[in-house]
């Protein structure tokens, strides 16, 4: 029984220009928010595909909230074109995009005994303090992901750089729990 993952969020970064005038962007883009006393970047949200941008004076851009890597590429390309259309001529229209983090969820569809899992997986790779947080934090070395395991059987995978790394994290957890007789 394979569990499928659902990508909840993709965070990616790129460099669209050598520098940006964030005050100009805020005045030209409806809905853009810039308050340098509160945060050094400009926040801009797009609806389709749904995502949010953090745009910095350095020309760097962080995109968050997309549900897949293809949407990240689409919204970053659209953002580059939009910035060019409002007068930023030095925009890189085909930027190199770096996925920084993917958050995914999965469901093993069974209740889990987190105390037994904590003992079985070994204390060097896990954090489990139920008084502090209801999930067990399991750090996997390869791929380098963190899997939050909940007693409901739900999993949250963070730190993946690709959907495949997130899927591999879930596969490893499932395999180890099966090997321990806990699934």
UniProtKB/Swiss-Prot annotation:
Sequence repeats lie at residues 7-83, 99-177. The keyword Zinc-finger does not apply. Signal peptide: none annotated. PROSITE patterns: TFIID. It holds the Pfam family TBP. One of its GO terms (molecular function) is DNA-binding transcription factor activity. The keyword S-adenosyl-L-methionine does not apply. InterPro entries: TBP, TBP_archaea, TBP_CS, TBP_dom_sf. Keywords: DNA-binding, Repeat, Transcription, Transcription regulation. GO terms for biological process: DNA-templated transcription initiation. PANTHER family: TATA-BOX BINDING PROTEIN (PTHR10126). General factor that plays a role in the activation of archaeal genes transcribed by RNA polymerase. Binds specifically to the TATA box promoter element which lies close to the position of transcription initiation. Belongs to the TBP family. This is TATA-box-binding protein. It comes from Methanothrix thermoacetophila (strain DSM 6194 / JCM 14653 / NBRC 101360 / PT) (Methanosaeta thermophila). The gene is tbp.
